Amino acid sequence: MSAPLTALGPDPAEPLPRAAGLALDLTGRTALVTGAAGGIGRACALRLAAAGARVRAVDRAAEGLETLAGEAAALPGDLEPRLLDLTDLDAAEASAAGTDILVNNAGLQLVRPIEEFPPDVFHTVLTVMLEAPFRLIRGALPHMYGQGWGRVVNISSVHGLRASAFKSAYVAAKHGLEGLSKTAALEGAPHGVTSNCVSPGYVRTPLVERQIADQAAAHGIPPERVLSEVLLKDAALKRLIEPDEVAEAVLYLCTPQASFITGTSLTLDGGWTAH
């Protein structure tokens, strides 16, 4: 009789315990993170500051930035809250001057069928999630080129690789961001600058939590069924990814070991795009 099968490790559907994380000293480097007041941006700002970077934390939410600054006070790197609305494109570009590491993260979401999608919201989504990253990269590259080193990390999404119904603006913006990131990689390579996307699936963030009601209305189901029947229906790992997990991937792309990685997308989707 064969022995019964035993588990070979932790349940992949459960988040792993917090580990020490990557060891990387970013002392002397300046990082800029957009959408830093919450979610993925907050996690990235704190992780980079923990590695010693001077972090410009950009957001339009003053209260969230104030909370973030308090959380970062004991970390090795300095964190500077910067109140900025990314629809002010000239100000966005100017804010990126002198940046060594740029994390384009800010985003917004509205779930509606195309025929009901407000054109002004579509325009705002594309402005914040595609045109602003272009302007920020444009503002950061002269300094990066001048010193022969730079890291551009664009927080994309599985929706930069695949489409979903009712998300026309978000999907269009993320697909555009993937193309912008690849172009920056090709242009930046001779100057020591890498550009990559980190493309997570559904992350435990306020943005995802806010869209559950919209998804329920769009699909005609109760909100409590959205996670299992819509968001995670096609994922192999049936859980939301944590913001800290995304931040570790961002940090990895700033390590010397990742210097040959450019023009690609690091997908953290629990197998969502394997179909």
Feature-to-residue mapping (PLM):
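Active-site helix of classical SDR
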Residues: I137, A173, S181
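Conserved glycine-rich cofactor-binding loop
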Residues: T30, A37-G38
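Residue(s) in the substrate-gating loop at a strand-loop-helix junction
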Residues: S157
